[in-house]
UniProtKB/Swiss-Prot annotation:
PROSITE patterns: COMPLEX1_30K. It is a peripheral membrane protein. The lineage of its organism: Eukaryota, Viridiplantae, Streptophyta, Embryophyta, Tracheophyta. GO terms for molecular function: NADH dehydrogenase (ubiquinone) activity; quinone binding. Its EC number is 7.1.1.-. It catalyses: a plastoquinone + NADH + (n+1) H(+)(in) = a plastoquinol + NAD(+) + n H(+)(out); a plastoquinone + NADPH + (n+1) H(+)(in) = a plastoquinol + NADP(+) + n H(+)(out). One of its GO terms (cellular component) is plastid. Coiled coil: none annotated. This is NAD(P)H-quinone oxidoreductase subunit J, chloroplastic. Keywords: Chloroplast, Membrane, NAD, NADP, Plastid, Plastoquinone, Quinone, Thylakoid, Translocase, Transport. It is found in: Plastid, Chloroplast thylakoid membrane. It comes from Oryza sativa subsp. indica (Rice). The keyword Transmembrane helix does not apply. The keyword Protein biosynthesis does not apply.
Length: 159
């Protein structure tokens, strides 16, 4: 499998990762261990990836792991030719913990909160990690594949 510049750089500096190749738009995708995410995030920011385009999370498989996905952009040579990279950080479903990157990219605030709320990934050192879409009293994480839908929903006044 062909590796991009980031994967080659990480190999050169002995940072453990797994190259997942390139997507249909030619964007390099890497799998990173949760314990390495802090240092790799700093490396990417210093290199110029100062824009977090999006962050999302998904359930890989029932009983399997959860993934937090970060799409980062670096605009160096003009807006028409941005460099992008996709980082996937996996966590075990029994204790899904991933370091928050709020202190690097402030735009991750609501995105990490939504991932916590819908999938149940805890983002360590996030300053306001609480539910953002579901009521605080909600039990479970609705976007997990093993989620059991309640038999009833309490209708709440929006005011």
């Amino acid at each position: 499998m062909q590796q991009g510049w980031l994967s080659n750089w990480l190999v050169k500096h002995e940072v453990v990762h797994r190259s997942l190749g390139f997507d249909h738009r030619g964007i390099e995708t890497l799998q990173i261990k949760a314990e390495d995410w802090d240092s790799i995030a700093v490396i990417l920011y210093v290199y110029g990836y100062n824009y977090l385009r999006s962050q999302c999370a998904y359930d890989v498989a029932p009983g399997g792991s959860l993934a937090s996905v970060y799409h980062l952009t670096r605009i160096q040579y003009g807006i028409d030719n941005p460099e992008e990279v996709c980082i996937k950080v996996f966590a075990q479903k029994d204790n899904p913990r991933i370091p928050s990157v709020f202190w690097i990219w402030r735009s991750s605030d609501f995105q990490e909160r939504e991932s916590f709320d819908m999938v149940g990934i805890s983002y360590d050192n996030h300053p306001r990690l609480k539910r953002i879409l579901m009521p605080e009293s909600w039990i479970g994480w609705p976007l997990r594949k093993d989620y059991i839908t309640p038999n009833f929903y309490e209708i709440q006044d929006a005011h």
